[in-house]
């Protein structure tokens, strides 16, 4: 029987918007040619404050056109205390923004789905074979998390690609554990390993209070090949397994959309940029990004600068309907078993009688058509 599967990513900073959009676009392309038995829903989890305060209407319209469901998430209980408690370990990574990745603990609350496949916004699936991941472990339980070993410490898993079974009891246990425990790395990867991975939890009595059944299922590395891997990468292995790589994960501070130097002239970085250009071209956005690293990868600047919002750029167009977008956020009706989750999430979907010039009908309208109607080609 077909499962209801959510393929999710998390947006906790507008800096990752280019990654989230490109990821969604790539997933849509690949799903068109993949043989998938499950019912797939592309979801974006986004922090409530970020969604309400930092995105403009046209940016939201583009997000809505690429994701079937936008799930507005609240901060975790005592999240600020957890961030402060983990500050020292997080400083070792020199990545303070990763404190917000603790929000991934909300994934287990998505009980309207049978299974959740989580992908970081800085990942890029390469081919339709990537979706075979959904068939690898048909008997996965709520106590198991499937993930790829981390290249920096293979006894731990990398949280850029996660396969899990949503469960409210598990969500509560994980979030309680998160509040009480200092993460190995100050972020989600450490705490998830300490919760699910017995190797990382030497306090057995703490682990057993949750469940003795906790298990990390090791996925093949080809489902989450991290780059750059200076000092780690095995060139012979990359050459041997190249045709079998399913997904690339651009780890570290600099992303394909944030830097353009010869140091990052790798094939996979170029592939990501090519995919981004394709997205903007098909959405008729290319003309609006001629001076930005966000859309014009050939810029001579080496470092990413915060671009003007999409609204500012799109308002330079001649179409009046580019200037006004009415967005009504409503809650999706859920059955009784999902009401407890609904209290924690606001699910955005189109209203039955949209007031804007754009109509988003996921079931009957091709996603590309929706994008092109939301962002019509500028008059020349």
From Swiss-Prot:
Ranges for region Disordered: 331-357
CDD domains according to UniProt: GT8_Glycogenin
Annotated Basic and acidic residues bias: 341-351
Residues that bind Mn(2+): 120, 122, 249
Glycosylation-annotated residues: 230, 232, 367
UniProt-listed GO biological process terms: glycogen biosynthetic process
Binding positions (UDP-alpha-D-glucose): 10, 16, 95, 104, 120-122, 158-159, 185, 188-189, 252, 255
Entry keyword annotation includes Transcription regulation: no
GO CC list: cytoplasm; vacuole
Gene Ontology molecular function: any one: glycogenin glucosyltransferase activity
Localization per Swiss-Prot or TrEMBL: Cytoplasm; Vacuole
Cofactor needs: Mn(2+)
Positions annotated to bind UDP: 10, 16, 95, 120-122, 249, 252, 255
Site positions for Important for catalytic activity: 104
Main location as per UniProt: cytoplasm
Alphabetized UniProt keyword annotations: Cytoplasm, Glycogen biosynthesis, Glycoprotein, Manganese, Metal-binding, Transferase, Vacuole
Listed EC numbers: 2.4.1.186
Subunit-level organization: Interacts with glycogen synthase GSY2.
Family the UniProt entry places it in: Belongs to the glycosyltransferase 8 family. Glycogenin subfamily.
Name listed for the protein in its UniProt record: Glycogenin-2
Organism of origin: Saccharomyces cerevisiae (strain YJM789) (Baker's yeast)
